[in-house]
Amino acid sequence: MNAYAYTACLGIYGSTPNNEQLVLGSPDQLQRNKPRFRLIVLPHAPAASPFYPPWRSFAPDWEGQGARPMDHFKVGNLRFQLETHRIDEHSTFGKLFGHAPSPSQSCVSFQKKSDRAEPLLLARCSAASWSCIHPPTVLYFVAYQLEYPFAARFSATKISPIQDKMVATSDVPIVGSLYVYAPNKGAPIFFTIAFAISTILHSWQCHRYKAWKLIWLQPACAALFTLGYALREYGAYNYLYDGTEKAPLALFILSQICIYLGPPLLELANYHILGRVFHYVPYAAPFNPGRVTAFFGGLMAIVEGLSGSGVSLTANAKAKESTKKTGHNLLLVALALQVCVIFIFVYLSVLFHRRCIKAKVPAQSKAVKSTLMTLYLSMALIFIRCVFRLVEMATSSTSVDITSMERLMKLSPVLRNEAYFYAFEASLMLINSFLWNVQHPGPHLPGDTHIYLAQDGTEVEGEGDGSEDRPLLLNMANTLMFGLLYRDDKDHTHSQPQELYENPNGNGHKKFRLGNGGRAT
């Protein structure tokens, strides 16, 4: 076994911490304990000292070293990542130490087994940000496992569970992280499995109720989210980007695109369902039901184009600053437009709902009421998500530059803390997906636009718009192209037929076709 032994010399002004030896003797030990191995250091030394900020490397034989600032370093099989926290007497760490630490000649060095001192580069930051010690900065060095075999020994301050919890919940970014922070490793697994289950349920329900033409976008979006969070799980272990490896960056961009494009497509699915509800009660529709998908779809086409372009520009760590700002602005415009479209949807839905009540649509309109309430809840979830994204974008004073701690600290706390993402993005979209599993429109709405609800409560098969005569894939393509392939402009103002006969439909509904003068027996 290749063994390395390093000693960390720690000093904090006004305190005498109890140091304990932490021995990492196997990969399992490191894997189990690595989140707790942190060294708390106050960086300050006389100007004449080689440790004077910005600290530099004097060990060119070790990987990643050279006469330049860095945010991390590697020694043997260990990787040390720098995180910084500014503190004062009111902060978490000021309260922890009882006061704001004063300047001291505290520094940290690592020694090889030969006891020959080798000062290592510890921080990447500007000289200006480190030349003033008021307020001071606390550094955390976290040991990461790189490869086997290894053994290491540290002399470090013992961290209490309270301290460790404080550090773990911090929103301080990590330099070099594609996500800005260190992504949670368990959450993507949960959401990948949950969205996969929803995808399977949607697919089964579409087959069971013959509702592929009605709601096929729901299983498609759930599958898109499944892929996005599966790739995010890969990114949770490969989030540090140094500009050399292409795979982490490419998969990160693909993951972001999948997660960002899902909600606008879910909106499009809701607009398509609203159009089908208008077909079902055409005399209460605010305008021609056949134009709903084309109208909302045209607006969502713009949103999708802006979102896709914006994500691809902002997620690319190699892009220029001007390019990232352009992507940032495109996303802001897309989100603002998305919110406007939601307001238009709500207005038309409420207007339609009031017309149904005024027309005293009979008891069979339970299908309409149930579907409308589900649409309202779904759009509320998407609206909250849009507001979250707008706040995230609008409160960030700069585009993401993962190489600069100063730029990262200017980002919105909403962007720097992963908890907000899972609360207002992932969770809301998962709830929306399962909402349509529970309140699937298949059992309530007829499977084609030929069927509508007459004012006496019977379901009547009228002329229709011809869309059900097209192949399934052609209908899907029309929806995916935002209703622009076919424009169903036929008049849908049906008259009340006098004689009908019953014909069972595949999804459990009863069709009533116009008879030739005789009543069905």
UniProtKB/Swiss-Prot annotation:
Domain of life per record: Eukaryota
Keyword vocabulary terms for this entry: Membrane, Transmembrane, Transmembrane helix
Positions of the UniProt region annotated as Disordered: 493-521
Induction behaviour: Expression is positively regulated by the phomenoic acid biosynthesis cluster-specific transcription regulator C6TF.
Xref: InterPro entries: RTA1
Subcellular location, record wording: Membrane
Membrane topology value: Multi-pass membrane protein
The keyword Protein transport is assigned to this record: no
Disulfide bonds, paired cysteine numbers: none
Residue stretches spanning the membrane: 186-206, 211-231, 249-269, 292-312, 332-352, 371-391, 418-438
A GO CC term attached to the entry: membrane
Span of the signal peptide: none
Function description: Lipid-translocating exporter-like protein; part of the gene cluster that mediates the biosynthesis of phomenoic acid, a long chain aliphatic carboxylic acid that does not appear to be essential for pathogenicity but may play a role in allowing to outcompete other fungi in the environmental niche via its antifungal properties.
Entry's family note: Belongs to the lipid-translocating exporter (LTE) (TC 9.A.26.1) family.
Name recorded for this polypeptide: Lipid-translocating exporter-like protein RTA1
Organism from which the protein derives: Leptosphaeria maculans (strain JN3 / isolate v23.1.3 / race Av1-4-5-6-7-8)
